[in-house]
């Protein structure tokens, strides 16, 4: 957590979009990396540790800032976006972009829940995890068949304290040093495992469609990361709904980490 996630969480709390991925072949422990064996103690995964970090910071700064946190949980299954917290999978969710109010890329129709504690977030995560698509393959008895994104928007507003009001209202021509409102989107993404057709045993039917969709979206993600690292002018975010959704949290001044899980 200290090496791959802490910097991203601190950035999100200061107004920088961020994304953390768990990537690897199916059965390598990506979901365990994210959630861990327990929500307390040393067995915590990245998400419980991140939530501890976030809400401890919110509490520590409660005299200076008002925080508004909203959580969503979505899966991308065969290139279909599905709400894991209100699982009416017949409902169409659409990726939109708001340039007028500065929301950036968002999912129209996706549920969003105001959260004020780690326990509230974990309860929603449990609900979403139960609705996530899993299936047995030759490589994993509980293989995730979708990419799942835990999404947390963090808005921070300065309290109207006397000191802040004085800074905002100075008439001496000095730069305004009052705290500003910040907004950031944090994505923690459990990617479905990459698979080979022969080793997974999914040569036909729905499992094959899932595998093909998983591998295509992972390929699109790899292409975007490669283009960003090479500073190319065109980044192919629109090649997959996965990369389109994460567009604001991959490019620009966003912070991104990739945790790669491998079998020993």
Name each region found by the language model.
Residues 1-264:
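Microtubule-binding structural modules
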